[in-house]
Amino acid sequence: MYVLLTKRLARSLWRTKIRLVAVLLIIMVGVFSGIAFGHYAHTASTMYDEIYADTEDGINLPDIWVENPGAVWNGNQADSWCEHISTQWPESELVLNECEARLILDGMLLIEEDEEESKLIPAIWHGIDEGYIDRVWMPEDDCCSGRLAVADDEIVLDAHIADEMEIAIGDTISIGAGQGIMDYTIVGIGFHSNHLYFATPGSILPAEAGTFATGYLSSTGLERLANLSSGSANRLLIDLVGSPDYDLLSTDEVEGVELAELIISIRSSIESVNSTAIVYDRSGVS
């Protein structure tokens, strides 16, 4: 029965050669697309593992983030939160290595299009001193060069925006955060883990040229720009000893059971002192 049906199908397709060719082409495209995507996924996974690693060439991606979405802690508050998390650490096989405060603010980049007109581009500015966690990535490549921002009027510009807008080291740009706009000298070109996929927040599409910017100042540089006190922060970056598993949203299993339990404990500890901060691991990073 099956043999007869197969023969009839073959005769029918042979009578319509164009349809047969189309079917074969669709099958071939599907097979080659699957192979190509599998190779890309493997390559991308390996590349990101190397970037995120706690090595000399990596950036040491945090294991846990504590984010204050509605406000900014002053320096004393940020330090006390790290101390609170350390002293309230639960019994766990996961060991705290570092807790670093970080300031990240929405802002703008001012571009002079001609002598009479200027353009404001939405931006995100990071206050990053040379810490231990989530460092600026500046590989030895044509894409990147220079050094980290040290002075409070220096900035490392993201390589995506530098390449798109033909901005180079030594150039001066005008940026804002809050109510002020100030000039900063570009001393480096690099990348950051938050913006390896360069898109505006909330969008799944890559940002078009001239529509979004990111840059990495010193902590004092961003505090100066936003008129904030020394040590201000709205993120806590927590690094654990080793590389614990974390839950993958693409599966139904809970891969990082110990990390999930630790996050619940940290969240409960923070909520006990009436904080609105949110706590998440790498699975919660978009």
Model-derived features: where do they sit?
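Membrane transport/envelope proteins' first extracytoplasmic loop
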Residues: 2-286
